[in-house]
Amino acid sequence: PRVLIDVMTELIKPQLGDKCFDPACGTFGFMIAANRYVNAHNDMYALSDRQADFQQNKAFNGVELVHETHRLALMNAYLHNMNANITLGDSLAQSAKGLKDFDVILTNPPFGTKKGGERATRDDISFQTSNKQLNFLQVIYRSLKADGKARCAVVLPDNVLFAAGDGASVRRELMNFCNLHTILRLPTGIFYAQGVKTNVLFFTRGTTEQDNTTEVAFYDMRTNMDSFGKTRQLRKSDFDEFVAGYEDPSKRTGERWSRFTREEIAKNPDDSLDLGLIRDDSIVDYDDLPDPVESGEEAIANLEEAVDLLKSVVRELRALTEEK
């Protein structure tokens, strides 16, 4: 939703002269929000010719894989008076290897596996997995400028926080390369299909590639929250408590805020970051759920029974009509 894009952008605070990037840009929404933020916080008429040229032609960049969506991104940028660099291609492919040294990355990578399980072809990431989000995460933190200031906000599903194997390796590398300082646990059903659980990871690239994360703050916007959807849409005011604590750690009061040191995280199996959720006894444990195959077959049987019943009703109505 637009409100989440705006909140992420306002917390990352893109500045004049920042080179911004979205490696899975869709229709370019994040970069348009970044451009809007820069314009709102600066006197654009006071820029030098060099500054104006950079903002117009070099500041905002993106990559989009789908041809039709790429065309929409170009059109969207044009309508917002942005001569942006939007590449038609795959950020996980070798051809995108040169897209590096960005000051700001704002993105929402697609879910799923890479081409039905094919691994990323870039040779500059450490762990080439079939998990698209883990590959994108590696591309993202390796695409940030290693100056201690380059920063990112990225939407990722829960599995990135706890996946074993390469998932654990990617999390360790992320926390080594970057200061992963904040994780926002989002409500279900606001960004994707109902039931998909997502998070926003906020991190800053370090100047080194070792021990940059010392502590991670978590904010639980998921447990005991309203059910968001068509009848109750997400509002900017829903983020007020999170934004206040993000910008001023002294305001991180209340049960929704928690923090864990790197040493505490290391004690979790696979360096899991699946932390920071308030205990909610109303939530059913996954282990207690019925077998999904059996549940699916039962649902099919119930639907077939309902269809048969509906058919019989139609037959009876037709017979009554014919009698008249």
What are these regions (language model features)?
Residues P1-T107, G112-K114, D123, S130, ...:
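Conserved S-adenosyl-L-methionine
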Residues L99-K324:
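A conserved structural/catalytic subdomain of Rossmann-like adenosyl-cofactor enzymes
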